[in-house]
């Protein structure tokens, strides 16, 4: 059964366009690789400054290992 790690970022104090570019073009791939995640998705919470990244793992053990 898959397990998920959800990361919420408050971008209200930074340039959200720069953050968006960095996350999409650099960080998401690197984080997925570092976490050894099966899949990774990202997006924005509508009408807010919050960004979400969702990392999918094969099981809860692998998700917990990503946080160590």
Predicted regions located by residue number:
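Macromolecular interaction modules
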Residues: 1-68
């Amino acid at each position: 059964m898959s397990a998920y790690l959800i990361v919420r970022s408050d971008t209200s104090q930074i340039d959200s366009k720069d953050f968006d570019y960095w996350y999409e073009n650099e960080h998401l791939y690197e984080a997925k690789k570092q976490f050894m995640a099966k899949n990774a998705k990202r997006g924005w919470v509508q009408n807010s400054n919050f960004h979400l990244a969702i990392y999918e793992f094969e099981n809860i053990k692998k998700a917990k290992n990503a946080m160590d």
